[in-house]
From Swiss-Prot:
Name the record gives this protein: O-phosphoserine--tRNA(Cys) ligase
Sequence similarity: Belongs to the class-II aminoacyl-tRNA synthetase family. O-phosphoseryl-tRNA(Cys) synthetase subfamily.
InterPro entries: aa-tRNA-synth_II (IPR006195), aa-tRNA-synth_II/BPL/LPL (IPR045864), O-Pseryl-tRNA(Cys)_ligase (IPR005246), Phenylalanyl-tRNA_Synthase (IPR002319), SepRS_C (IPR041590)
Assembly mode: Homotetramer. Interacts with SepCysS.
This enzyme's EC code(s): 6.1.1.27
Length: 531
């Protein structure tokens, strides 16, 4: 908090050592919620696939490749041009685009009667004609589907809800529509787009042309599995020029993949022979990873002149492609691409550190004075914890809400101590469980291997007492706070965030914050408030 600079200058000149020791008095008490591990600076987490995409983009750009965006929608005829007789087998793996046809809706007397019944009024001849024109415009495509309801509402002078009812009840043609496929497909591999792009560029740029694209592709797999997705990312590049050879693929593989920690490379002919590549050029790239050893990471080859000729491309083209998800699996050492791509649909793992940060106090004082009161209660109770009852100790005196308040920690009964044995218990998270444990040999493993929340039972109860006293003082009342046996987190003023609690129960872990606390705190307010 702010402090008086001149005052501290004066104190330092008069008694430097005393002024130095008073330094902490200018600090605002953090309170339990302001302590680590609840207080932390966090970095937002990028999605692993998009992180690899970004690294690939940066690497390609650093290698001198220009970025391109290839067409995502490819006509069926282009597949035949690229694959030749193999096209039929390839088309079995592509998604065709379809849509709902626009019905030819007629308006007879029967439909008009039903519309009038819904509207509760007659439809004039002029409105009838406009209604026909609107439906005809929708059929012809001059009115979009998402505008139809609004346009009909304007014609009929009715609200959208009535129009939706009319469309559903009067025109069953809309409900009976079935999708119809077109001859357009979603790109199943980046090569389909490269032919289209290069056919427009190869005579308009200086050769060699070096382009890359990291983008979505779609493949109609029979089912998705640990290594296969229907929607995936391809990181692909092309080099087009008069003197392009297969050696380009080897050099690019090393330059690109060395950025991901691969150190050695091996190239071998691919047993699969795609017809858009020249014979004997389709090559698999294996790279040595320092942790995983030799893994297959990419494929390259030189496009067949027969396929290039279909697009009027008159120079050799080398193409290299790799699956981004495959590279991400290697980088993150994952064994299921589905979990890496869509982690939200799989069980979430939460570390002990994260669970510890999810343990909070239910009630805390709000003011600086209240926080100092909580610290004083804790310190006084800890200092006199073993004092035999009956006993009472003044923990704090100060002003709250314009009133002088005295806070007393006490034990009114005989044959007991000021604090129960569990007051010194500290809350740890160990192997997913939240445990309140004392500092004894039995719990040494938990205290050494677990993650501390930085909260003891005494911390939590002291904050509870300070919060209640603070609130009572605002109302001009005294407070009496007593905590006896703890069985639940709420008994010692603790709460665990819902997501962490769900993780604990889902994994059959436990929350054990039991123990005899037995601490009593009360406040005393003089009759007259301070002025």
């Amino acid at each position: 908090m702010r402090f008086d600079v001149e005052e501290f200058k004066k104190r330092a000149r008069e008694d430097f050592e005393h002024a130095w020791h008073e330094g902490p008095s200018v600090l605002t008490p953090a309170g339990v919620s302001g302590r680590y591990p609840r207080l932390r600076y966090t970095r937002a987490t990028p999605h692993p696939i998009f992180e690899i995409v970004q690294r690939l983009r940066e690497t390609y750009l650093a290698m001198g490749f220009d970025e391109a965006m290839n067409p995502l929608i490819v006509e069926e005829s282009d597949i035949y041009r690229q694959f030749g007789p193999e096209a039929m087998a390839v088309l079995d793996r592509v998604f065709y685009l379809g849509g709902l046809p626009r019905p030819n809706v007629g308006i007879a007397r029967k439909q008009l009667d039903e519309i009038e019944a819904i509207l509760g009024r007659a439809v004039s001849p002029g409105t009838e004609e406009k209604l026909r024109e609107t439906l005809h415009g929708y059929k012809k495509g001059t009115i979009d589907g998402d505008e139809l309801t609004h346009e009909l509402a304007a014609v009929l002078e009715a609200d959208d809800a009535a129009v939706v009812h009319i469309l559903d009840a009067v025109f069953p043609e809309f409900r009976e529509l079935a999708p119809e496929s077109s001859r357009n497909t979603l790109r199943s591999h980046m090569t389909s787009g490269w032919f289209l792009t290069l056919s427009s560029l190869w005579e308009k740029r200086h050769l060699p042309i070096r382009l890359f694209s990291v983008d979505r592709c779609f493949r109609r797999e029979q089912e998705e599995g640990p290594t296969r997705l229907m929607a995936y990312h391809s990181a692909s590049c092309v080099v087009a020029g008069e003197d392009v050879t297969l050696e380009e693929g080897k050099a690019i593989s090393e330059a690109l993949l060395s950025a991901f920690g691969f150190t050695e490379f091996r190239f071998q002919p691919d047993e699969k022979r795609s017809k858009y590549y020249m014979p004997e050029t389709q090559t698999e790239v294996y790279a040595r990873h320092p942790v995983l050893g030799w893994v297959e990471v990419a494929t390259f080859g030189i496009y067949s002149p027969s396929a290039l000729a279909e697009y009027g491309i008159g120079v050799p083209v080398m193409n290299l492609g790799l699956g981004v998800e495959r590279l991400a699996m290697i980088a993150y050492q994952s064994n299921d691409i589905r979990q890496l791509t869509h982690p939200q649909f799989f069980p979430q793992e939460i570390s002990d550190r994260e669970v510890a940060g999810a343990v909070h106090l239910r009630e805390e004082p709000r003011t600086v004075a209240g926080k100092r009161m909580a610290e004083a209660i804790r310190a006084t109770a800890a200092e006199h914890a073993t004092a035999p009852g009956p006993c009472a100790f003044t923990a704090w005196k100060g002003e709250i809400a314009g009133r002088e308040v005295e806070v007393i920690v006490e034990e009114p009964e005989s044959n007991t101590k000021l604090c129960g044995p569990a007051c010194a218990n500290e809350v740890f998270v160990h192997d997913g469980s939240v445990l309140g444990v004392p500092d004894i040999e039995k719990w040494a493993t938990v205290r050494q291997e677990g993650v501390s929340t930085g909260i003891t039972y005494l911390d939590a109860v002291s904050s509870l007492a300070a919060a209640r006293i603070e609130e009572a003082a605002r109302c001009g009342e005294e407070a009496h706070v007593q905590v006896k046996m703890s069985k639940l987190p709420s008994d010692v003023n603790l709460r665990i965030e819902e997501y962490a609690m769900r993780h604990i129960t889902d994994h059959n872990k436990k929350v054990d914050l039991r123990g005899p606390v037995f601490l009593t705190v009360r406040s005393v307010i003089p009759e007259q408030p301070t002025r």
